[in-house]
Amino acid sequence: MEVIMAKDWSNCKTIYTIGATNHSEEVRASEDYYATEPKAVEVLLEAEKFCPVIWEPACGEGHMSEVLKKHGHIVTSTDLVDRGYGDISDFLNSDFKVEKCDIITNPPYKYALEFCQRAIDVLDDGHKVAMFLRLQFLESKRRKQFFLDNPPKIVYVSSSRLHCARNGNFSDATGSKSNAVAYAWFVWEKGYQGTTSLKWIN
């Protein structure tokens, strides 16, 4: 495994509310790792077209990357933490980038806004960013200016709940495959300054 660059920005073993009240005392997964079920990528690809080259900068154990490869994409997979898949690279602080690519990922919850901004910054005009985020990412004064400056081209809301699993464990009940959180795909196109469309998928 090639080490591109790593810097520990993720020392975040902190308690956060992650959904309904029955989850309010749960501890965030190690390094904020919640794997995305492959179906989430499948429904995105049914709704949205992407360029052949994809960068997945928070690849975890490759759940998203493998679906993208199955659909014929050339995928560069990186992550701050070595989980046995992809290359080690600090997306927020490294100079590493993939040329002429689109970016598709589920960013760490604590750094979601920073991931969105960084992804838009490193892309070439006309290329896309697709972030799998909680629907409530639309809220907050902190993110308002970001959305005004960088309006998503489209937000795909899942009409059926899609799942994330703590530490990538979808088979174990302790993996927190929970229906308590509503997710959406936020899609930006570099340079787009129009109105954000809202569509339903799944």
Where in this protein do the model-derived segments appear?
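Class I S-adenosyl-L-methionine-dependent methyltransferase catalytic core
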Residues: 1-202
